[in-house]
Regions:
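Bacterial N-terminal signal peptides that target proteins for export
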Residues: 1-10
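C-terminal motif of bacterial Sec signal peptides marking the signal peptidase cleavage site
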Residues: 17-20
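Extracellular/periplasmic metallocenter environments
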Residues: 23-34, 53, 100-139
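N-terminal edge beta-strand
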Residues: 32, 37-66
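N-terminal post-signal-peptidase region of extra-cytosolic proteins
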Residues: 49-57, 68, 92-95, 103-105
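Beta-strand cores of secreted/periplasmic/IMS beta-sandwich domains, seen most often
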Residues: 57-78, 105-114, 118, 138
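Beta-strand signatures of extracellular beta-sandwich domains
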Residues: 81-85
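Short edge-strand/loop segments of extracellular domains
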Residues: 86-92, 138-139
Length: 139
């Protein structure tokens, strides 16, 4: 193979890898975190937003106490969001509130009012079908 072609193949492989081709969130194991309250009672939790998965994918909070969720975007190229819209449980993080791109950090605040398990997901294109989902557990 000529040297120029080998360089092109290597560059194409690197680009596809960087774009997350072939990545599936369904193969990522479930990880869990319990939100930590500060002195004022606000529960804090950090969720990393990767290529087609959230880490942790299971977040545990207490009902009736405010939650500050920090979303840390860990992907350079593909935009994502975190959507969790359950008005009956006091949780409303819509597509635009949880939208981010290009290594940004975003904070969303809500006060869950009712215990239960509430799914969250990425509402961009087919990301949810690729396994970009999680669960907010309210105790």
């Amino acid at each position: 193979m000529p040297r120029v072609s080998l360089v092109r193949v290597a560059a194409a492989a690197l680009l596809m890898s960087a774009l997350g081709c072939g990545t599936s969130g369904s193969k990522i194991p479930v990880s869990e975190v319990v939100a930590k309250p500060d002195a004022s009672g606000v529960q804090h939790v950090v969720v990393e937003v990767h290529s087609f998965y959230f880490k942790p994918s299971r977040v545990v909070v207490e009902s009736g106490r405010p939650v500050e969720m920090t979303l840390k975007f860990k992907n350079f190229f593909t935009p994502h969001n975190l959507t969790c819209d359950h008005a009956d449980g006091g949780i409303r993080i819509d597509k635009s509130a949880g939208f981010m791109s290009f290594r940004r950090t975003k904070e969303v605040r809500f006060t869950p009012g009712m215990p239960g398990e509430y799914p969250f997901y990425c509402g961009v294109d087919s990301h949810m079908k690729k396994g970009m989902t999680g669960t907010l557990v309210v105790r």
